[in-house]
């Protein structure tokens, strides 16, 4: 973390940072692909025979912001994710799970994860996890594929005959949202669900 903080590199230019992370993983016995996924500062590190039932990608972020360094905390997030991958690799047999550490650069701009998804990099993983800092001391888990969001619609009452233009019909807004979701649903692939 200290090395990354002392050598901030902006999105897509994380050459020394990615090199340091890869060197650390190699020193711990990981085999690495570097560069990876067509990105000069990305990597994938695999520990052991890679023959367990499940596969987990531990994602690391390590880019800095222009002019202000690691204000988003990727120096810590990346280091913690790296250490989590190293620690989990020691119990792969008990978990029946292969642990792969995947470097995801350029998260403050384009977001390398999006391009990696489009390339199918994550298709063979059962789960992808990562650490990111927050302004509170807590553990927070969100499964984006299983998110449930509640929307509340509020209207404004008015007299239907004397001044309907002063009112706001919450049901109209709710119906527009439901119709919009229904239009999007037709574009979803079979492995995605969008319910309303």
Locations of regions flagged by a protein language model:
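Histidine/acidic-residue-rich, glycine-tolerant segments that coordinate divalent metal ions
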Residues: 41-46, 63-71, 75-76, 82, ...
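Acidic/His- and Gly-rich active-site-bordering loop/insert found
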Residues: 1-96
């Amino acid at each position: 973390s200290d090395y990354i903080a002392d050598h901030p590199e902006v999105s897509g230019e994380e050459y020394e940072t990615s090199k340091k992370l890869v060197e650390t993983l190699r020193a711990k016995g990981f085999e690495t692909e570097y560069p990876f996924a067509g990105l000069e500062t990305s990597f994938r590190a695999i520990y052991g025979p890679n023959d367990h039932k499940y596969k987990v990608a531990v994602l690391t972020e390590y880019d800095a912001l222009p002019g202000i360094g690691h204000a988003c905390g990727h120096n810590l997030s990346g280091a913690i994710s790296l250490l989590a991958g190293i620690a989990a690799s020691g119990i792969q047999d008990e978990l029946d799970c292969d642990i792969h550490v995947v470097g995801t650069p350029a998260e403050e701009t384009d977001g390398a994860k999006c391009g990696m998804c489009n390339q199918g990099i994550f298709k063979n993983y059962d789960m992808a996890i990562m650490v990111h800092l927050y302004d509170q001391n807590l553990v927070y888990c969100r499964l984006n594929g299983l998110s449930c969001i509640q929307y509340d619609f509020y209207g404004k009452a008015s007299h239907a005959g004397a001044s309907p233009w002063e009112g706001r019909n919450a049901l109209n807004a709710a119906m527009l949202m439901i119709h919009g979701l229904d239009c999007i649903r037709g574009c979803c692939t079979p492995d995605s669900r969008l319910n309303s």
